[in-house]
């Protein structure tokens, strides 16, 4: 047998082994009687079009959810791994709240692709360490602490209004068109810079400032970063050995230096600024006090280090930079396409403005605006910041409904996805879900729904939801007080079909027309 035949035989053997390895886990759903999609070798049920941004992902999520109507759980294979999607409201409540101790953690695969510093962030921590960090951070997000930081956010909102006013003055027309993803990313950037990192930046004036530029680079999902994440999922040990990073360490070092310098300056000069660094420094000092108390359980209490503090700042950055900007894009998009809603909201805003008699809007006034609250809640229903959240089962458990009927048997290591976006667009949960209707929140009924969860579910929901709501309401109040929001020529009329790929953005962007109110 010549060398070419040997090489061909080895190649065929390698292909067979690769095939067998790629499909080795594809019997999980069949063995457990779970409704599922037929997988392709290696890629599972993740279409290549979705990977390269050629598919309306949100629309496909709804279609998949609808296809499995009647099943409390359905499954797909993400590459080689089985993922259980939970669509039954009672089962979601069991997993997220009642039996939370069995489902404390997010998918452990997340930790495989986390850089060392981000592995210390609240979203990545597991078990007792997560609970400890959550308890440390919770006091920093109370209503009283939000009230302290409100002025910083309000200042950023006012700068955003000034920018549009200046653009209108420069325009030859009575209106201007803006791409809102860029606009709200700059707003979110300035809020995060001042609230989480203690620095004031006006990204509307200094368009290419370093903080904004590096933030854009870190939040941008490139094809190579997707490939690296997939390789981490397939070959976690190899990727760790090769020390391949998903994020650029130079960018992380930049933010690390900002936090370290801010902490050192404040400690040396006894500076107090009402922002996240100050609140986290307070939490750090409280932790040191707890550690010095010998009556505490020393095995439970661990030190809150500078790296822990930095990790939380980075987490706030990622959450604020992308999630807030996207949520504001969707919210203002709905307002421009629903003029009746916008007009009614403007009536409430102008009424509050007149009550203030020239005084600045306060946090308490903002939080008591009922219709503004309804509009924001409905926008978060239709376009939730997190399209899905996950839990990993810690130990085997049978889950039963209130009548004693078994809903699902979860096994240790199972990854359970709660498809928030699909649940919010399910007519069984919300009547006429594609219709933007703030009135569904008029009596609080929709808010109490077991499947309304824009910020997650249970004890592991988003700790910063109060701050997120404050940001959304603050900038929307200022924009509608000063401008009419109208559809532009490039405004998408079919977002579900136009949003493709990994980012929640239509292919042509979010375009709005602004007219100054008289």
Curated annotation (Swiss-Prot):
Enzyme nomenclature, EC number: 1.14.-.-
Record field: transmembrane: none
Binding site for heme: 462
Disulfide bonds: none
Enzyme class: oxidoreductase
Protein function: May be involved in the metabolism of insect hormones and in the breakdown of synthetic insecticides.
Identification of the protein by name: Probable cytochrome P450 9h1
Species name: Drosophila melanogaster
Lineage: Eukaryota, Metazoa, Ecdysozoa, Arthropoda, Hexapoda
């Amino acid at each position: 047998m010549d060398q070419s035949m040997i090489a061909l035989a080895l190649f065929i053997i390698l292909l067979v082994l690769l095939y067998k390895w790629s499909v080795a886990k594809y019997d999980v759903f069949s063995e457990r009687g779970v409704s599922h999609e037929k997988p392709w070798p290696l890629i599972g049920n993740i279409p290549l079009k979705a990977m390269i941004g050629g598919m309306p992902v949100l629309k496909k999520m709804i279609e998949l959810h609808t296809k499995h109507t009647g099943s409390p759980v359905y499954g797909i294979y993400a590459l080689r791994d089985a993922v259980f999607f939970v669509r039954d409201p009672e089962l979601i409540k069991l997993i997220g709240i009642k039996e939370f101790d069995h489902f404390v953690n997010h998918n452990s695969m997340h930790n495989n692709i986390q850089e060392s510093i981000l592995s210390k962030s609240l979203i990545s921590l597991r078990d007792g360490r997560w609970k400890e960090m959550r308890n440390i951070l919770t006091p920093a997000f109370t209503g009283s602490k939000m009230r302290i930081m409100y002025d910083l956010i309000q200042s950023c909102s006012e700068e955003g209004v000034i920018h549009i006013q200046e653009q209108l003055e420069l325009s030859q027309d009575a209106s201007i068109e803006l791409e809102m993803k860029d606009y709200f990313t700059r707003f979110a950037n300035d809020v995060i810079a001042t609230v989480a990192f203690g620095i004031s930046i006006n990204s509307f004036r200094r368009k290419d400032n370093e903080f904004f530029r590096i933030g854009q680079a870190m939040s941008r999902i490139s094809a190579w970063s997707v490939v690296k994440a997939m390789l981490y999922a397939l070959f976690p040990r190899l990727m760790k050995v090769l020390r391949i990073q998903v994020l650029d360490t130079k960018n992380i070092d930049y933010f690390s230096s900002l936090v370290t310098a801010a902490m050192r300056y404040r400690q040396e000069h006894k500076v107090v600024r009402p922002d996240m660094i100050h609140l986290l420094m307070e939490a750090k000092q409280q932790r040191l006090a707890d550690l010095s108390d010998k009556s505490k359980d020393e095995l439970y209490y661990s030190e809150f280090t500078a790296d822990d503090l930095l990790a939380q700042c980075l987490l706030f950055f990622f959450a604020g930079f992308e999630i807030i900007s996207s949520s504001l894009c969707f919210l203002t998009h709905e307002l421009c396409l629903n003029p009746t809603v916008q007009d009614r909201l403007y009536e409430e805003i102008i009424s509050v403005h007149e009550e203030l008699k020239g005084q600045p809007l306060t946090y308490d006034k903002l939080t008591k605006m009922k219709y503004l609250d309804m509009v924001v809640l409905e926008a978060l229903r239709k376009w939730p910041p997190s399209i899905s959240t996950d839990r990993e089962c810690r130990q085997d458990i049978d889950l039963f409904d209130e009548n004693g009927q078994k809903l699902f048997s979860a096994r240790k290591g199972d990854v359970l996805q709660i498809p928030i976006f699909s649940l919010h667009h399910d007519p069984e949960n919300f009547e006429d879900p594609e219709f933007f209707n703030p009135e569904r929140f008029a009596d609080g009924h929709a808010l109490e729904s077991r499947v309304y969860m824009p910020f997650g579910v249970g004890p592991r929901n988003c700790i910063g939801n109060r701050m997120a709501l404050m940001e959304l309401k603050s900038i929307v109040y200022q924009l509608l007080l000063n401008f009419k929001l109208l559809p532009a020529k490039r405004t998408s009329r079919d977002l579900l079909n136009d949003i493709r790929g990994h980012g929640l953005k239509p292919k042509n962007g979010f375009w709005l027309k602004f007219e100054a109110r008289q």
